[in-house]
């Protein structure tokens, strides 16, 4: 596992937060810095067909070292970190041989506690890499980036049989844009794995169907003293809309395969208001029903408004559940599960309550389930990753490459 930790710490030192609402891809300059660094490292490692597109997709190939009809496979991670929490001046803490209890995050009152995060009880004796309480860590997905780079180094430096290994690093995954500019044909893999999951053993091939709902409300503002029969309060209409959304179908009240409506932002005045929801559901029919529900709510609340006042609703699908594409190729999951078992890991098949680049890529002709990275609590100050989990991810990547070669020989 030469340089795994060193690589990871170097990558998280670069601020690569993506930014929503920006037309350009990548959305931030910091992502270019990491992409150029990775390009240089791939060149130094001796990979071939290295390309960095104008949209920030970095691709490279580790050529096969054995003969045979071996399918080319790929591994993909994203370089951006979430815009939900600061990713600037990340200052990781390394906690060796974790013995339980609270971990102080920097100087202050912030702690990483097993009371709030019981998974810590399962990680006794391991090396934890945490934040200092002021930023996110960036293990999502720089752990995946470091693991792929380290796996390439292992395959390059050891006589482990493998076919062509394609790797790609994408931008703007956190804002849903990176995979839209991914050239599947140029990539040249028959299938791939994103390395963007969580705890050791996770293997994910189901994700939410996802849509965004943007609501614009135009009211009418007059002096409150003479408002009767004239004022139309856009904020009151917004409140009525949200009151119609099922309260027990929110992110904080759902789990597993349950879908939800999530009010992500709301702002406005009496005259004008805006609301932004996201809709998520694993079941396609329920997903479509949720979209219809939002339209029905808007019509109900907007009924009878003055013609100059209105509610405008725009729904846009973001991505779909990749299950329907991945299950057509069961060997992809079989190989990953066998690789985990060979590395003394129990595979844990679970749905992604979110999305990955792999969801979009699967519908673009590249079946692409998701492998674990060893990280936890993404997108916030309690994010952490275990060194042992990262090492296991490297072992699984290498073993997948080896098993694929054996099937083709």
From Swiss-Prot:
Active site (UniProt): 80, 173 (proton acceptor)
Cofactor, how bound (note): Binds 2 Zn(2+) ions per subunit.
Residues that bind Zn(2+) 2: 140, 174, 379
Compartment(s): Cytoplasm
Main location: cytoplasm
Gene3D superfamilies linked: 3.30.70.360, Zn peptidases
Enzyme Commission (EC) number: 3.4.11.4
Gene Ontology BP annotations: peptide catabolic process; proteolysis
One GO term describing the cellular component: cytosol
GO function term, MF aspect, one: metallopeptidase activity
Presence of keyword Metal-binding: yes
Superkingdom to which the source organism belongs: Bacteria
EC class of the enzyme, as a word: hydrolase
Keywords assigned: Aminopeptidase, Cytoplasm, Hydrolase, Metal-binding, Metalloprotease, Protease, Zinc
Keyword Transmembrane: no
Cofactor(s) it depends on: Zn(2+)
Catalytic function, reaction form: Release of the N-terminal residue from a tripeptide
Chain residues that bind Zn(2+) 1: 78, 140, 196
Family, similarity comment: Belongs to the peptidase M20B family.
Biological role: Cleaves the N-terminal amino acid of tripeptides.
UniProt-recorded name of the protein: Peptidase T
The organism of origin for this protein: Salmonella schwarzengrund (strain CVM19633)
The organism's taxonomic lineage, starting at the top: Bacteria, Pseudomonadati, Pseudomonadota, Gammaproteobacteria, Enterobacterales
């Amino acid at each position: 596992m030469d340089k795994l930790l060193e690589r990871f710490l170097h990558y998280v030192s670069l601020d690569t937060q993506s930014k929503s609402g920006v037309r350009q891809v990548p959305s931030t300059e910091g992502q270019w810095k990491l992409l150029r660094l990775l390009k240089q490292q791939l060149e130094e490692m001796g990979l071939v067909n290295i390309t960095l597109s104008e949209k920030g997709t970095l691709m490279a190939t580790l050529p096969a070292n054995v003969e045979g009809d071996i399918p080319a496979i790929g591994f993909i991670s994203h370089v951006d970190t979430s815009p939900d929490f600061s990713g600037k001046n990340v200052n990781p803490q390394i906690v060796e041989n974790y013995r339980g209890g609270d971990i102080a995050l920097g100087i202050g009152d912030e702690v990483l506690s097993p009371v709030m995060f019981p998974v810590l009880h399962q990680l006794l004796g391991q090396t934890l890499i945490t934040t200092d309480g002021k930023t996110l860590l960036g293990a999502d997905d720089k752990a995946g980036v470091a693991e792929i780079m380290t796996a390439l180094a292992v395959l390059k430096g050891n006589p482990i049989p493998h076919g062509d290994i394609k790797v790609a690093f994408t931008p703007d995954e956190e804002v849903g844009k990176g995979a839209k500019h991914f050239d599947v044909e140029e990539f040249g893999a028959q299938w791939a794995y994103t390395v963007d999951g969580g705890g050791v053993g996770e293997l994910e091939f189901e994700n939410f169907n996802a849509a965004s709902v943007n609501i614009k409300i135009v009211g009418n503002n007059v002096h409150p003293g003479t408002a009767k029969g004239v004022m139309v309060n856009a904020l009151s209409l917004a409140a009525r809309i949200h009151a119609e959304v099922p309260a027990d179908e929110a992110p904080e009240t759902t789990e597993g395969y349950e879908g939800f409506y999530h009010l992500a932002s709301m702002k406005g005045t009496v005259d004008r208001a805006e609301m932004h929801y996201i809709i998520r559901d694993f079941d396609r029919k329920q997903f479509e029903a949720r979209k219809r529900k939002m339209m029905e709510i808007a019509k109900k609340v907007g009924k009878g408004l003055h013609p100059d006042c209105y509610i405008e609703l725009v729904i846009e699908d973001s991505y779909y559940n990749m299950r329907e594409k991945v299950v057509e190729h069961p060997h992809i999951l079989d190989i990953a599960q066998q690789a985990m078992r060979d590395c003394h890991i129990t595979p844990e098949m679970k749905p992604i309550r979110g999305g990955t680049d792999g969801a979009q890529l699967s519908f673009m002709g590249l079946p692409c389930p998701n492998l674990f990275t060893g990280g936890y609590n993404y997108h916030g100050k309690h994010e952490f990753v275990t060194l042992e989990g990262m090492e296991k991810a490297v072992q699984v990547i290498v073993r997948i490459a080896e098993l694929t070669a054996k099937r083709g020989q």
